[in-house]
């Protein structure tokens, strides 16, 4: 019996639940490997070859190579693990988060310092707030997949 997941109706949000955890196990393990300097060096020297050493899906590998964190998350990546990719690339977490929203680092920081996104129009998918897919750089691709 499938679980009722009312949280899937939150726009602009991928909930890292047990299903996402299973789906993203190998992409997250790859990210954890970047904790070691020698693995970061191997990855940067030949990214496709390093990724081929992991039993990730081809979609996960493409998402990593594209540095598309929204795509990585849709394939099961957890943002706290994915942050290691950004760190390997010399990016701050603010830069990474900004890239996920289509904002510059400064725009993202200013939005967060000002209290974050308004909940108005962002409580459920289908409203017209700023977190809705039609207002995001990933567009309708940002919707949760079945």
What spans do the regions from the language model cover?
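Charged, low-complexity intrinsically disordered segments
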Residues: 1-146
């Amino acid at each position: 019996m499938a679980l009722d997941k009312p949280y899937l109706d939150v726009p602009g949000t991928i909930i890292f639940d047990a299903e996402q955890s299973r789906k993203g196990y190998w992409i997250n393990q790859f990210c954890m490997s970047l904790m070691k300097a020698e693995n970061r060096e191997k990855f940067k020297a030949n990214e496709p070859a390093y990724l081929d050493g992991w039993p990730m899906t081809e979609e996960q590998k493409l998402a990593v190579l594209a540095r598309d964190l929204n795509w990585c998350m849709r394939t099961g990546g957890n943002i706290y693990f994915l942050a290691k990719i950004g760190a390997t690339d010399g990016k701050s977490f603010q830069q990474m988060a900004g890239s996920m929203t289509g904002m510059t680092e400064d725009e993202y920081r200013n939005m967060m310092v000002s209290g974050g996104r308004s909940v108005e129009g962002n409580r459920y998918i289908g409203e017209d707030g700023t977190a809705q897919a039609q207002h995001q750089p990933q567009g309708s691709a940002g919707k949760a997949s079945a």
